[in-house]
């Protein structure tokens, strides 16, 4: 297995993903100021994919990590608005940092993000599994 997987920092979300979402995905609603985000929610979203328990990684491989990252960015609402859009750009950024990309239409990905957002939290594992399958369909090497 490839050992050099790169995580994302809060600063990268602020300066890359958040800014890109704000510039290119305003659509109907504005995205509020980065400083208005909820304390610790974003930190948790970014840390969870890399957590271990009893010496074992909870999420193995890039697809699993990307899937839980996207799920948490959408479902945990780290921002007051724009969570789905910021989640999309964060996903692209995480993949590109790890030499991957998704060849998917923005609207299709946004529709999928809306589906994830409306999913039943009790079905978290099934939803994350669906995200993994979605990623497998569209992921490409950079």
Task: State what each model feature region is.
Residues 1-142:
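FIC/Doc superfamily catalytic core
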């Amino acid at each position: 297995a490839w050992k050099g997987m790169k995580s994302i920092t809060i600063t990268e979300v602020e300066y890359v993903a958040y800014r890109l979402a704000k510039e290119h995905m305003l659509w109907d609603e504005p995205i509020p100021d980065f400083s208005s985000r909820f304390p610790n929610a974003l930190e948790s979203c970014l840390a969870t994919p890399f957590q271990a328990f009893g010496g074992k990684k909870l999420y193995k491989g890039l697809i699993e990590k990307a899937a839980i990252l996207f799920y948490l960015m959408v479902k945990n609402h780290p921002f007051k608005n724009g969570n789905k859009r910021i989640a999309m750009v964060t996903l692209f950024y995480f993949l590109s940092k790890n030499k991957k990309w998704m060849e998917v239409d923005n609207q299709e990905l946004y529709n999928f993000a809306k589906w994830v957002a409306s999913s039943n939290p009790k079905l978290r594992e099934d939803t994350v599994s669906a995200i993994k399958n979605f990623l497998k369909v569209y992921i490409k090497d950079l």
